[in-house]
Design a protein with these regions (language model features):
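Short, Lys/Arg-enriched charge-dense amphipathic segments
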Residues: 14, 71-88, 133-139, 149-153
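Flexible, glycine- and charge-enriched loops at secondary-structure boundaries
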Residues: 28, 32, 87, 129, ...
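A structural "domain/chain start" motif
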Residues: 1-35, 125, 149-163
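C-terminal/domain-edge helix-coil "capping" segments
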Residues: 48-50, 93-95, 104-163
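Surface-exposed short loop/turn segments
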Residues: 44, 48-107, 118-127
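Stable alpha-helical elements in mature extracytoplasmic
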Residues: 30, 34, 38, 42, ...
Length: 163
C-alpha cells in the first residue's frame, strides 16, 4: 500500500483562519483514502495490462514501494455539524516516490519521483470528498499508465525474439 505524508505545515495552514479545524483523525482518514485510491487505480491499470498482482515474493515478481509525499489537499471535506460548503480553484497537489525491487534479492531496480498538481482554471469549484477522490484518481491514473508503459517496455526488451 502507498504510504502518505502531508506537505510540511499542512494542518497548521489549513486551520489558520478557518472555523472548521482539521484534526489528526481527519488526516489519517485522508491518508487512508489516498492509499485506497492508489491501490484501486494502479491495480486496475496493471491488471488491464496483463500484469498479475502478487501478495508473495517469487521469480519475476517486483516489489513496488510507493509513497505519496507533500500531499496538499486544498479543500479537505471535513465532517461538520450543519451544511458547510468549501470552494477552491484546485484539488491540490502531491508527489509520488516509487521504488521497484526484485522481490527475491531485494535489489533496487528502479526509482521514480513525479509531482502532480491539479489543474488551475481560474474557477472556484465546490470541493467534496467525492470530487477530491475523483481528482486524486485522475492524477494517479497518469502515474499508473506511466508505470505500465515502463513495464511493457522492459518486458518487450527482455522477451526473446520469436524465430
Amino acid at each position: 500500500d502507498a504510504t502518505g505524508a502531508f506537505k510540511k505545515n499542512w494542518k497548521r495552514n489549513q486551520n489558520r483562519g478557518n472555523t472548521l479545524k482539521v484534526r489528526d483523525s481527519d488526516m489519517v482518514k485522508i491518508q487512508e483514502e489516498v492509499a485506497d485510491v492508489f491501490r484501486e487505480v494502479f491495480t486496475k491499470e496493471l491488471t488491464e495490462g496483463g500484469y498479475e498482482i502478487a501478495d508473495e515474493e517469487g521469480e519475476d515478481v517486483l516489489l513496488v514501494k510507493p509513497a505519496i509525499v507533500d500531499l496538499d489537499v486544498a479543500a479537505p471535506d471535513i465532517p461538520s455539524p450543519g451544511r458547510t460548503m468549501t470552494y477552491a480553484e484546485s484539488a491540490g497537489e502531491m508527489t509520488l516516490n516509487l521504488e521497484l525491487y526484485d522481490s527475491l534479492t531485494n535489489d533496487k531496480i528502479a526509482k521514480a519521483t513525479d509531482r502532480k498538481r491539479d489543474r488551475l482554471d481560474g474557477r472556484m469549484e465546490w470541493r467534496t470528498k467525492v470530487s477530491n477522490r475523483a481528482d486524486a484518481r485522475r492524477m494517479m491514473s497518469g502515474w499508473a499508465k506511466a508505470l505500465r508503459s515502463a513495464l511493457d517496455e522492459a518486458r518487450a526488451s527482455t522477451t526473446p525474439a520469436a524465430d
